[in-house]
């Protein structure tokens, strides 16, 4: 009965393990470790557990089922029936029966291999390390053995083998725990070979010694024992890392209790932390809660007001001061008013504290008023310490502002008075109207203040009294004049010495001055006055091309050709209107080359006799003008003011932008030029003026053509040349009085600009310009050569040089 119950409880795999007789073990403990397989291959070698299956099976698996019970009963009956046989025969029979039963079973080869690998475990160590299951099975095995001994007569031998059985069961219990899960079954081939060939114990010992040392097997046995215990530990580790419900619930509970790590939860925790502190501070939990809330609500607006005050940007003294000079100065006043209103909303306690602390600080409005009353003075410490009276400084500022306003208001009347007196139609430079360019920013007026030069288009203006061109770009039409009037102008045109407050002599042409001196027959030509030929050389390229298109020609790229074509067209157009008095065959006013002069001389060959008579009249008129007294000049000036007061006159430096160089001492500034004018006037005995007008003389004022070159100078001319000023100074004045180039790209700079830019001056070109146009600006009839121009350039430190192909011929 006990055996059946044991089989039901402890059998985990009954198909693999069969029960054997427990009473008669065939081998002792000494033979358990000496068995070896017959074949050389380790796969067919049986293990010690195969040889001693009855004790090992009784230790790990309880004998269960009817098979084991029937085998026991049969064995007991055979033992009772064959008492005559000796102990050896009974043991052989039991071994044969056990072998037959083992053949029907299937054992895995892995089990035999693992047991063969570890055949010699340290038995004394396992005695102390046996598990509870092993001890329980040991007790049951002892009970079964005692029952068998009671039933059998010769159970003394069983007692002898009990200690060996217990030792083997301990060893096999340890090995079965490892190999039971690995080996699915045993093969019966090992037992068949073992019965045929025997055990071969000595050979097995050699193989076992060569196979594994004893020390290593002992350590491996300990490791196997530990692995059996580590099974549960590894399972516990997996339970910690596994997704078990209990572990997940515990983790979620701990997280919920501590608070989730999200930002929203943290913000909620921070918000809910304040009421806890307020509850701690409140003395009564229920009665004073309403009072605490009311006090919080009352303190909340005050705290908000404080925070707003702190967050507001502090206005500094520098900001207050500079705000007065900006356009949005009223914004600061509004900000001050808002600050006052915000301060009124604060509670009385806060106001009292602030007043006690800041009693010496003014209110924002009073501070702004105080700043407005102050006078800001900019200067060094020494400059500010000179005057201590604030009223004097305030009066000084008022006077400065008044003087500026008066200068702006009186600018136009002064220009009209100067125009009436024949000095300036405008000031030398005007105030800033619009910012133009770098040169105008660097320009300065007579007082030394920065100003912008007012530039007029002097394209078609030959007389001082004529109006400037219209703003729409149209060229002004001249009033028709008689050729005889032009001749009279040439006879009587001489600069008049006029000194203003600055002592500047200006060349003023008197159109009606010759009427009192000319003969009555010359006035008859005034009715047939024609317009003089305009100065095409002073026109812009765009105006020249437009005028050429008006005459029906195609636009030309060469500027000189356009000027020649326009001159011929103009002469052909106005030749029919002439009444017998031809134009003077002098140098053309456009500044063209000698070719243009020859063209004009060829057109006027028919009137060569008339030209000679006109020349004689001009010489006589010049002598008469020089002999006149100053009273006659004053009468002429009074007669001229009536005419010139109605028209704007051109100043000497009006349309020239002064390009001054700090190191250029050769070319004088306007103020230096004025002093030179005074000096030359005082030195000259003949009272010959030094004209500074930028407008050239009339065409009849100079006779420097091929026809005039043949004539010999008269004694009167030689007498006047001795009293003329230095020719070098005349060249300097002519260079400074040359009009600026009006081209946009400045491809045609003036001689003055070339000198300032240190461009090399070609002496031949410079001498040609002086003889044709330059000296005519200063009313100089003398001519200069290239060698004289070279001396003038070298004396003034100007870079100059001859042309390569014409230097030898010039010398």
Swiss-Prot record:
Its main location: nucleus. It is found in: Nucleus. GO terms for molecular function: 5'-flap endonuclease activity. The keyword DNA damage applies. It comes from the Eukaryota. Residues 90-103 have a biased composition (Basic residues). Residues 107-116, 599-609, 712-723 have a biased composition (Polar residues). Residues 281-291, 611-642 have a biased composition (Basic and acidic residues). Residues 38-49, 689-704 have a biased composition (Low complexity). The keyword Nucleus applies. GO terms for biological process: DNA recombination; DNA repair; DNA replication. CDD domains: SAP_SLX4. Phosphorylated in response to DNA damage. One of its GO terms (cellular component) is Slx1-Slx4 complex. Keywords: DNA damage, DNA recombination, DNA repair, Nucleus, Phosphoprotein. Residues 38-193, 266-312, 464-498, 579-649, 680-726 are annotated as: Disordered. Belongs to the SLX4 family. Forms a heterodimer with slx1. Regulatory subunit of the slx1-slx4 structure-specific endonuclease that resolves DNA secondary structures generated during DNA repair and recombination. Has endonuclease activity towards branched DNA substrates, introducing single-strand cuts in duplex DNA close to junctions with ss-DNA. This is Structure-specific endonuclease subunit slx4.
